[in-house]
């Protein structure tokens, strides 16, 4: 009898990259549905534009690099990059913005480094930050939730706003906001920071229509709960590990609680931090990117906690209302250092 000795690894994970990406895309459905419910069909249209751009640009670069196009596109990583960017930008942003951001994310932030598995920074967040720095006005032009919107644009108006900048009746973004008192910026985090800088107290800010008596903001807390539900699905399917989301949310919640207890008249409450902006999207769908996150369990805890601290610092003292994208990229920079000091010790090695 002949015994064959196989080389390591002796255990195999049968899940392919494409299957994991499909699970993530499936988990994103609740967040997309709820975000569309509160903010309109623009969310879906931005996703379609981002997906088409991601596939087209990735295919073009792969052709230039003389690599297999179909096999690479089937891993769905480009599609996920486009989706994460699309749900992060205002639903009525001009069409060319999501195209530009997605192309930059795929070509510069991903393929320039060698493709999937080689990029040190999260591509979607690179694309988002490029757009935010280059076009700050358009990137902060969110309409308030449809619950308090002065007028709800029809699907045809949404199409025209994205592709022409005007509705069929000639209205623009300013006219869609008309009649909503006290809203200069439509997201709760935008409104909170802008109003505090204008000299209003926290109690006065929370009386604005964008909050509607809900500390995390009308619509936004349900959007975050939907992304949380998708994240729990990923944990149940073991598509992601618990270390990064838990440490991120604990760190953000702890910092927000301490800050709020110390200065309740100038800092946001823990509830607002946890259920506003891109908190849950970042915790479960962005920070958990296996390529750009730490690879050890202790490292993941440190990585997530660091990102949570950075989000709180940027939101509370920085120039941008939501610091998730910047926090992710800054935490990505530290990954090699974190992995170096948290790598398992080899048995017998001093």
Curated annotation (Swiss-Prot):
GO terms for cellular component: plasma membrane. The modification FMN phosphoryl threonine is found at residue 187. Belongs to the NqrB/RnfD family. It comes from Klebsiella pneumoniae (strain 342). It comes from the Bacteria. This is Ion-translocating oxidoreductase complex subunit D. It is a multi-pass membrane protein. HAMAP family: RsxD_RnfD. Its cofactor is FMN. It is found in: Cell inner membrane.
């Amino acid at each position: 009898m002949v015994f064959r000795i196989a080389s390591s690894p002796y255990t195999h994970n049968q899940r392919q990259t494409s299957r994991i990406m499909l699970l993530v895309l499936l988990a994103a459905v609740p967040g997309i549905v709820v975000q569309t419910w509160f903010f309109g069909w623009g969310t879906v249209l931005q996703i379609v534009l981002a997906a088409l751009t991601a596939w087209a640009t990735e295919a073009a670069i792969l052709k230039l690099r003389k690599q297999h196009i179909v096999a690479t596109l089937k891993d769905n990583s480009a599609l996920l990059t486009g989706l994460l960017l699309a749900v992060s930008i205002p639903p009525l942003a001009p069409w060319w913005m999501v195209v530009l951001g997605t192309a930059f994310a795929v070509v510069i932030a991903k393929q320039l480094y060698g493709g999937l598995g080689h990029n040190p920074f999260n591509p979607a967040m690179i694309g988002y930050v490029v757009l935010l720095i280059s076009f700050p006005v358009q990137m902060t032009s969110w309409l308030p939730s449809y619950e308090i919107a002065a007028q709800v644009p029809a699907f045809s108006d949404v199409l025209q706003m994205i592709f022409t900048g005007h509705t069929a009746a000639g209205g623009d973004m300013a006219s869609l906001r008309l009649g909503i008192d006290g809203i200069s910026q439509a997201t709760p985090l935008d409104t909170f920071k802008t109003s505090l800088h204008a000299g209003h107290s926290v109690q006065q800010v929370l009386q604005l229509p964008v909050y509607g008596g809900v500390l995390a903001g009308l619509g936004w807390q349900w959007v975050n709960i939907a992304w949380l539900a998708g994240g729990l699905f990923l944990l149940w399917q073991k598509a992601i590990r618990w270390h990064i989301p838990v440490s991120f949310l604990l760190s953000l919640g702890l910092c927000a609680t301490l800050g709020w207890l110390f200065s309740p008249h100038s800092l946001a409450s823990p509830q607002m931090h946890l259920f506003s902006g891109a908190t849950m999207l970042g915790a479960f769908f962005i920070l958990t990117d296996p390529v750009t996150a730490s690879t050890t369990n202790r490292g993941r805890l440190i990585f997530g906690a660091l990102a949570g601290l950075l989000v709180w610092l940027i939101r509370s003292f920085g120039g941008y209302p939501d610091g998730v994208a910047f926090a992710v990229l800054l935490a990505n920079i530290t990954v090699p250092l974190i992995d170096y000091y948290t790598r398992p010790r080899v048995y017998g090695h001093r």
